[in-house]
């Protein structure tokens, strides 16, 4: 009874945008990539916010929490729709000692990650026409990591690059972001979630008591004591 009540309460919160809806999750973000409509990068803006003063009166910059399409839980190389990870987006490794960027690594991870990002997002955004998605698609098709190892904006990021998490905005209109809940990408994800059919047939859910599709797997559960930091299965 308690679990069912909690499940119903979560549904109420989701309807009122108090928690993430199905198909979306929260991600800490440090920077916003500003894209011109032709796909070139006009700026990379730090969007971190100053924390409340601690007991000594000191403050620090903290990432903002943003709702993005659900992040992948698959091991190995797998891109996200609206990617936030620098290696996937830019296809570059940063060397802290030399302060330089390179596409090279022993397993070609940078190249493989960037390709996975580009292929997945071009396929998903096919046919979309909004200015921000057009800019994003142009970026996907134009950005060549090998030609961008000395990009001024990335050079200025320096060591922050490796731990940064990104979102995308439209140059001249920072209020328009790729992940906006009323944007084409978010709407497509919501529609896909509604249209997904049964995976392994229907049965009675042990939590809700309602009849529905049976999931083959579930996402990793984070915060479980003594479990892997990336989440428990």
Stretches with model-predicted labels:
Residues 210-233:
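Domain-exit/linker segments immediately C-terminal to small folded modules
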Residues 1-199, 203:
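Conserved phosphate-interacting/catalytic interface
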Residues 205-208:
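Short cysteine-rich clusters marking metal-coordination/redox-active sites
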């Amino acid at each position: 009874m308690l679990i069912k009540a909690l499940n119903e309460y979560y549904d109420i919160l989701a309807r009122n945008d108090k928690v993430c809806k199905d198909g979306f999750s929260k991600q800490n973000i440090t920077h916003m990539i500003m894209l011109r409509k032709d796909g070139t990068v006009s700026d990379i803006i730090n969007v971190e916010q100053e924390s409340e003063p601690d007991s000594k009166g000191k403050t620090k910059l903290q990432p903002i929490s943003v709702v993005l399409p659900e992040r992948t839980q698959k091991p190995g190389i797998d891109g996200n729709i609206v990617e936030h990870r620098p290696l996937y987006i830019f296809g570059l490794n940063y060397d802290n000692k030399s302060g330089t960027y390179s596409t090279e690594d022993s397993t070609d991870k940078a190249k493989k990650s960037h390709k996975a990002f580009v292929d997945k997002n071009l396929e998903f955004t096919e046919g979309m026409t909004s200015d921000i998605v057009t800019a994003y698609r142009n970026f996907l098709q134009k950005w060549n990591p090998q030609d961008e190892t000395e990009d001024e904006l990335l050079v200025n990021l320096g060591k922050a690059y490796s731990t940064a998490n990104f979102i995308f905005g439209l140059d001249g209109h920072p209020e328009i972001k790729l992940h906006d809940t009323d944007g084409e990408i978010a709407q497509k994800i919501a529609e896909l979630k509604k249209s997904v059919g049964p995976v392994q047939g229907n049965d009675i859910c042990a939590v809700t008591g309602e009849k529905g599709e049976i999931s083959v797997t579930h996402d990793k559960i984070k915060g479980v004591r003594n479990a892997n930091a990336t989440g428990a299965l």
